[in-house]
Amino acid sequence: NRRSIRKYTKQSIPEEILNQILLAGTYAPSAKNQQSAIILAVTNKEKRDQLSALNAKIMNVDASKDPFYGAPVVLIVLADKNNPNHVYDGSLVMQNLMLAAKSLNVGSCWIHRAKEMFETQEGKAFLKQHRIPDSYE
């Protein structure tokens, strides 16, 4: 019964619940068990809003139209583009995250445009600030 949620409360996700969701993502299968995908949990409101504005800019909509629908936490899945299976591996991680969230009564929605976000100068700076290698998308 998992479905995309497009309206969230301002209530933060308890750390214990968030950690369970993240753990499920880390146990996702990957091609050749290379485990190239990483998960960046953005819980800081200022950083979350920065990413929301960047995503809105890519959508070519006003920044007040939050592409993250007010979700208090944004989980970003990135994988090493040198791995030929990185898109599939990242997709499996996202599926595990979303199924775990549902099982813990936490709503989720797959939001696209991360690749485009992190190709911008602002996006590249964000990844660099978080010590994410350039080869990840």
What are these model-derived regions, one by one?
Residues 1-137:
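Acidic, surface-exposed loops and disordered segments
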